[in-house]
Amino acid sequence: MGQKIQPHGLRLGITSDWRSRWYADKQYADYLAEDIKIREFLSEGLERAGIANVVIERTHDRVRVDIHTARPGIVIGRRGSEADRIRGKLEKLTGKQVQLNILEVKNVDANAQLVAQSIAEQLVNRVAFRRAMRKAIQGAMRQPQVKGIKVVCSGRLGGAEMGRTERYHEGRVPLHTLRAEIDYGTHEAHTTFGRIGVKVWIYKGDVVGGRRESLMNARDERPSRGGRRERPRRGGARRQRAEKKQEG
């Protein structure tokens, strides 16, 4: 199960948070399609900016878009011209006032999405896929918070006639452990031989404290189904009389 499912979706509410934060009843499908268009517009228009994540929050008359990027200067532009252009496009797309927040990703080598984008860019530039994968693994493992990394590339690797899948990993990546903080990212490299898919999993240790700790404490307080409960001892009155005689 943990090997197949998307790691963020499996751990929602445990170690990861929602990337679309709003509630809707009848307009749910419209808002969802709108979020997809917003993310597609940002990923296609700001491909060189290294966008790691896009978080969207909605109120009744405003849309807040948080862009986590490795190169905030490209998103902002000269004197904020690029940010104003993006805000105008998003307001035209949503029909509401847009609050645009640009946040810098400090540690690029520990972000799975940025690592996947870096590998894909190297594949487009005709770098050997094994060299690109090993370089990404070495850069990630040098970070103190990274406990393990797994990289998968699929497609016509090296221009081969038949597509195949290559996997490299180092350290631990426990995909079945729900308390494990797993960062996941994907990207596609459009080469002259066709598309090559890149997937990256980065393990940053177990989450201790917060909501997860409270859930564990609540579970420990409940009696287990198969556990034996302590039963009251029989013959209590007779035993008490015998104990009183011994004391007397």
Swiss-Prot record:
Per UniProt, what is one GO molecular function of this protein?
A: rRNA binding
Q: Does the keyword RNA-binding apply?
A: yes
Q: Does the record carry rRNA-binding as a key word?
A: yes
Subunit-level organization:
Part of the 30S ribosomal subunit. Forms a tight complex with proteins S10 and S14.
Which residue stretches belong to region Disordered?
Answer: 214-248
SMART domains recorded: KH
**So what does this one do?**
Binds the lower part of the 30S subunit head. Binds mRNA in the 70S ribosome, positioning it for translation.
Tell me the ranges covered by the KH type-2 domain, including all copies: 38-106
Source organism lineage? Bacteria, Bacillati, Actinomycetota, Actinomycetes, Mycobacteriales
Q: Which family does it belong to?
A: Belongs to the universal ribosomal protein uS3 family.
InterPro entries on file: KH_dom, KH_dom-like_a/b, KH_dom_type_2, KH_sf_prok-type, Ribosomal_S3_C_sf, Ribosomal_uS3_bac-typ, Ribosomal_uS3_C, Ribosomal_uS3_CS
Name the record gives this protein: Small ribosomal subunit protein uS3
Q: Which UniProt keywords apply?
A: Ribonucleoprotein, Ribosomal protein, RNA-binding, rRNA-binding
Basic residues bias locations:
230-242
Q: Report one GO cellular component.
A: cytosolic small ribosomal subunit
**Highest taxon in the source lineage:** Bacteria
Q: Which Pfam families match?
A: KH_2, Ribosomal_S3_C
List this protein's GO terms for biological process: translation
Organism, scientific name: Corynebacterium urealyticum (strain ATCC 43042 / DSM 7109)
Ranges of compositional bias, category Basic and acidic residues: 214-229
